[in-house]
Regions:
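Short, extreme N-terminal segment that most often corresponds to the first beta-strand
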Residues: 1-40
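Charged interaction segments
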Residues: 51-188
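Glycine/tyrosine- and acidic-biased, solvent-exposed loop/turn segments at the edges of beta-strands
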Residues: 36, 44-56
Length: 188
C-alpha cells in the first residue's frame, strides 16, 4: 500500500481575487494543453489512458465547495476533518500581512485522478482578474518519501498563467519545510 502525498501551496493574491476564485465554477481540464508534460510516462492503476485521466478531473462545481471537502469530514473516519484542523495537518488561511493564501492537506491522496482534479482546480487561479498573481503549489511525498527532491507535480503561477514542473523554488521549499516541521501530532 502506498502512502498519501501532501498538497501544499502559497499563492500571492489579493483577498478580493481569492474571494472571486472561491466563488468561481471549476472549468474543464481541457482549458490547459500541457498535461502530457506531467502525465507522460506515468503509471496508474487500471487501464485508463492519459486522455481519460485528464478528462476525469472534477469540474462544474464551485471551487470553495470542492476545496472545502478537505477541511470537513474525511472518509477515513468520523471526525478526521476536525482532527486535521486541531493538530495543524490541514490549513486554508489568508495572511493579510503578506497578501498570501496558504494551504496544506497533509493526507491528500495517492491517486492520479485526485492529483489531476486538484491541479486543474487550483491552477485556475491564474485567470482571476486584478493585480498579477504569483506563487506555487506542490503535491509532494514529504513525510513518506524523498520530499522536495521528488515532487509529483509543481504548479508555478506567474504572469497570468500557470505552468507544470517538478521543482519548487528555494523560497517555497524553505517555507513549506517549515510548515511540515512545525506540525503537531497527538501523542498516545
Amino acid at each position: 500500500m502506498s502512502e498519501p502525498l501532501q498538497l501544499i501551496g502559497r499563492i500571492f493574491v489579493s483577498r478580493e481575487q481569492l474571494a472571486h476564485f472561491n466563488a468561481h465554477v471549476i472549468d474543464s481540464s481541457q482549458r490547459y494543453d500541457d498535461w502530457g508534460d506531467w502525465l507522460g510516462g506515468k503509471q496508474w492503476y487500471g487501464d485508463s489512458s492519459e486522455a481519460e485521466v485528464v478528462a476525469g478531473a472534477d469540474c462544474g462545481q464551485r471551487f470553495e465547495d470542492w476545496f472545502g471537502m478537505f477541511f470537513k469530514e474525511h472518509e477515513l473516519w468520523p471526525g478526521a476533518g476536525e482532527f486535521m484542523k486541531i493538530f495543524g495537518v490541514a490549513f486554508n488561511d489568508y495572511d493579510d500581512e503578506e497578501g498570501c493564501w496558504k494551504f496544506m492537506v497533509f493526507e491528500f491522496s495517492e491517486n492520479y485522478l485526485d492529483f489531476m482534479s486538484a491541479v486543474n482546480a487550483l491552477r485556475q487561479i491564474d485567470s482571476m482578474p486584478g493585480p498579477p498573481i504569483h506563487g506555487q503549489l506542490a503535491i509532494v511525498p514529504y513525510m513518506f518519501g524523498p520530499g522536495f527532491n521528488a515532487c509529483e507535480v509543481v504548479v508555478t503561477i506567474a504572469d497570468g498563467k500557470s505552468t507544470l514542473s517538478k521543482q519548487v523554488t528555494p523560497e517555497f521549499e524553505a517555507w513549506a519545510t517549515h510548515c511540515f516541521e512545525t506540525l503537531e501530532f497527538p501523542s498516545d
